[in-house]
Amino acid sequence: MNTSHKTLKTIAILGQPNVGKSSLFNRLARERIAITSDFAGTTRDINKRKIALNGHEVELLDTGGMAKDALLSKEIKALNLKAAQMSDLILYVVDGKSIPSDEDLKLFREVFKTNPNCFLVINKIDNDKEKERSYAFSSFGTPKSFNISVSHNRGISALIDAVLNALNLNQIIEQDLDADILESLETPNNALEETKEEEIIQVGIIGRVNVGKSSLLNALTKKERSLVSSVAGTTIDPIDETILIGDQKICFVDTAGIRHRGKILGIEKYALDRTQKALEKSHIALLVLDVSAPFVELDEKISSLADKHSLGIILILNKWDIRYAPYEEIMATLKRKFRFLEYAPVITTSCLKARHIDEIKHKIIEVYECFSKRIPTSSLNSVIFQATQKHPLPSDGGKLVKVYYATQFATKPPQISLIMNRPKALHFSYKRYLINTLRKEFNFLGTPLILNAKDKKSVQQN
């Protein structure tokens, strides 16, 4: 190992919560040190570790997430910026499966202003087809960006090489490759395995404890694969089972039930972390709701997980045979409480009696087709043009607002860029109008549709 440098080079991993900072820290450190979870703000303190990158000893810092609304956010942000100032290199991690927010861009610019020796690391780019997702981050304006997937170990070697070059630690060191290093290398076999995985629809079953998730899994697979009990929280680890419908493979993941945060202790915290990991790899969520009693606030919070992970979603109303109210009342309440999921199909069932199970299976395939849909550019622009003609864009301070053209740059979920002269003038209500128009024309059943306004000049520059 090279120890010729008396002062170790320091690398800080920064970014908003839930983007994979701690997972990257663990990957680079080659052991599980930081607690990783998909709940925003898991890392509160700065984790410091001496590690070896290709034989070079460096100091790695994993920082708390910099979310604006996080508890202790001001203190965490100040600590982050101090770490950035003291570091030789910053790895600013973003979630490649999401559209960058104004807050994302603002935080990155603050960090970059503090220390320009900064790499933009776009995580969760799990395969070649998802590379187009990284285009959404072109507005960050940095030439030093890297597409990686920590969970699939993609792009990590290239990132390490770039880090060593930036720190002037790029001399070749002769050393024996141990088993861990060999195991971490990206190989064509890994790529082939990922291609096979893409052919399987990944479905996460989510809901509160004891709403019937395990019973639903058993009914879907016709197996007693998941332990069913009246004791809340029977399922601890996610349990998966693959079935075949025609030529289509569907992998179901029965996740641990989620209860109020204040009651999460010990092994349930572990179970909740595993649930979040399972959802990150899912395409579609089956949100199971118990209609033997009125909906509760936690049902709404859990439903936001599908939105958070940009998943397709199907609402499953379980225990319909013992529902607490008439059909009309339940549907009216559902529409009111889950208004943001108005595009999701609703299926009533009794999992123990296996009612409407085939309908659920076929609806999964239908939603997945919508989730994977790509609209021809000519058709997309025709609909956008007609919509803007029918209801013109409001002016911005007396100045005309134009949409030059639209392009779909990603699927799973569908993501569309509107190339405009004044993108910041696109009001959320008008964006909602365009999304509703696209849903009506192209059928995005159960599928989130992401619309992203971009400046024409920035697109031309990139």
UniProtKB/Swiss-Prot annotation:
Pfam families per UniProt: KH_dom-like, MMR_HSR1
Domain EngA-type G: 9-171, 201-372
GO biological process, one term: ribosome biogenesis
Quaternary context: Associates with the 50S ribosomal subunit.
Keywords: GTP-binding, Nucleotide-binding, Repeat, Ribosome biogenesis
Residues annotated as domain KH-like: 373-457
The family this protein is said to belong to: Belongs to the TRAFAC class TrmE-Era-EngA-EngB-Septin-like GTPase superfamily. EngA (Der) GTPase family.
Full protein name: GTPase Der
Organism of provenance: Helicobacter pylori (strain J99 / ATCC 700824) (Campylobacter pylori J99)
